[in-house]
Amino acid sequence: MEGLSFGPLSILPSLAEELNPHRVAFLTNTTVERLWLEKAAEGIEEPIRIVIPDGEKYKSLETAVAIWKRLQEEGFTRKSLLIGLGGGVVTDIAGFVASTYMRGTLLGLVPTTLLAQVDAAIGGKTGVNFNGKNMIGTFYLPNFVLIAHETLSTLPEEEIRNGLGEVAKYALLDRKVYALARNFEGISETLIRECALFKVEVVEKDLGESGLRRILNLGHTAGHAIEKLSNYRIKHGLAVSMGLMVASKVGEELYGFDSGKTEELLKKLGLPTGHPFRAEEILEEMRLDKKAWYGRITFVIPVEIGDVVVEEVDEAVLKRALEATRDDSGSGDCQKPGGSA
Ligand SMILES: NC(=O)c1ccc[n+]([C@@H]2O[C@H](COP(=O)([O-])OP(=O)(O)OC[C@H]3O[C@@H](n4cnc5c(N)ncnc54)[C@H](O)[C@@H]3O)[C@@H](O)[C@H]2O)c1
């Protein structure tokens, strides 16, 4: 597994030096360049600076081509180090470019959003969008990931909440994360560390995503459908939060799971506990997804905190869970989380 380090940006030069690279290039976007590139590059000799526009739509092959070209012009080699500094969009493209340029260069990731620190930068999945999200990509483990808590100090509240959706997911999957999250008073280094380490542990057991890694889809089956139905107005993390509530209701009916624990947790984190759609609309969206995956879409169901099963669920059960979690009062808005970063 990749070397996961927790510490300030000032340790980046020593992480880079350990790899003895020919050259170092930073890949970042316009927003993170302004906020963090100078600090990250301190102590690294004449790094190449590649800055892409900010936004999911730039997670594209066109952007990858532009980066490959620039690396070639700069004489970047397989023994050079590409450092992706940014949110999940940047870390996904950095991984993709590093895995494909000259069949693979050295790669370091410095995730700067909560979502990227607990999820996107961990586990070796890289990619770009191409007629669909993440349609072109590779599995490529970075040489290091540096989780620098300080970078979250500039992250907007909305992006913190986006990441908290994934934190809530880990809390249902892991008792240690649950214990921290239910007493949430702001994003702590410990909470991020426990989430990140949990993902590392799962991924280490299943890099190719054939088995255990599927548990990381908890909340995502209904969540994706909700995200799509809202035309992506509902952000990923909030849709996942709604999806966790749906999955918990399914768990309650099938395995006696206490969905009140999920509700309490989501409220503590300032996340929505209900979705704004009709059950039939979400089911229809899920059926489309199921078709896209050759009818093999399964559901991750909480049995108790720290324990889930992965199985197909009868539509009637799903429908009841979707009806029980509908909240058309305010399209999933909710109170602020118990503190800030
Ligand atoms: N590879 C994986 O396993 C995996 C897992 C989950 C998500 N993803 C991908 O991650 C992407 C979403 O990641 P994201 O939520 O980080 O989005 P993002 O990268 O678009 O970042 C969100 C916003 O925050 C800004 N930002 C980043 N760091 C900042 C900082 N420190 N201060 C202020 N602003 C900052 C960005 O410029 C952007 O505007 C999606 O493309 C998704 O497919 C990948």
Curated annotation (Swiss-Prot):
Binding site for NAD(+): 54-59, 88-92, 112-113, 125, 133, 151-154
Principal location: cytoplasm
A GO CC annotation given for this chain: cytoplasm
Cofactor binding note: Binds 1 divalent metal cation per subunit. Can use either Co(2+) or Zn(2+).
Highest taxon of the lineage: Archaea
EC top class named in words: lyase
CDD domains listed in its UniProt record: DHQS
Pathway: Metabolic intermediate biosynthesis; chorismate biosynthesis; chorismate from D-erythrose 4-phosphate and phosphoenolpyruvate: step 2/7
One GO BP annotation of this record: aromatic amino acid family biosynthetic process
Catalytic activity field: 7-phospho-2-dehydro-3-deoxy-D-arabino-heptonate = 3-dehydroquinate + phosphate
Gene3D superfamilies found in the cross-reference section: 3.40.50.1970, Dehydroquinate synthase-like - alpha domain
Entry's localization field: Cytoplasm
Protein keywords: Amino-acid biosynthesis, Aromatic amino acid biosynthesis, Cobalt, Cytoplasm, Lyase, Metal-binding, NAD, Nucleotide-binding, Zinc
Signal peptide annotation: none
EC number(s) given by UniProt: 4.2.3.4
Binding sites annotated in the UniProt record for Zn(2+): E166, H220, H236
Cofactor(s), names only, from the UniProt record: NAD(+); Co(2+); Zn(2+)
SUPFAM superfamilies (alphabetical): Dehydroquinate synthase-like
Pfam family, one: DHQS_C
One MF annotation (Gene Ontology) recorded for this entry: 3-dehydroquinate synthase activity
Role played: Catalyzes the conversion of 3-deoxy-D-arabino-heptulosonate 7-phosphate (DAHP) to dehydroquinate (DHQ).
Family per similarity comment: Belongs to the sugar phosphate cyclases superfamily. Dehydroquinate synthase family.
Official protein name in the record: 3-dehydroquinate synthase
